[in-house]
Amino acid sequence: MRKILSNCPVSCFADEISVSLDRQIQVLNELGIKFVEFRSADGTGVADFTDEQAKEAKKRLDAAGIRVSAVGSPIGKIGIEDDFEAHMKKLQRIERIADIFETPYIRMFSFYLPENADPKDYRDAVMKRMERMVQEAKASRLVLLDENE
């Protein structure tokens, strides 16, 4: 099993190991995992990182030989009727974090619909928002990876 995995890059959410970035790094190294989908560390979600926090996390990961495969963002984890402009500002912030982490990938979601709603009634609204986010990411040479919930 280990031989197979040695030829296949493995990435994980290390914040499910521990809140502490130091502990995350320790366990990743013990397991031989060299990639992380960075979502949070030391009690702060990646979307709330300052540039300084992101640079420090990147420095610590680099020192351990661990690369960020993608930013595990909360983008799209809002209601389809929620304030989209504020969310676009958050996406722009996460684009900056992705740049610091030297990854072109941002994991995101495709919005929550109202309870008992018919998805067909919201398809156009979802697609319009997704298109705008894709264009924003594309302008920054980034790729959005949609996770369906």
Regions found by a protein language model. Give the residues of each.
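Active-site acidic/histidine proton-transfer and metal-coordination neighborhood
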Residues: 20-26, 60-63, 79-149
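Structural motif
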Residues: 31, 39, 100-101
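Glycine-rich, proline-tolerant flexible connector loops at the mouths of alpha/beta enzymes
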Residues: 37-62, 110-117
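Aromatic-lined carbohydrate-binding surfaces of glycoside hydrolases
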Residues: 75
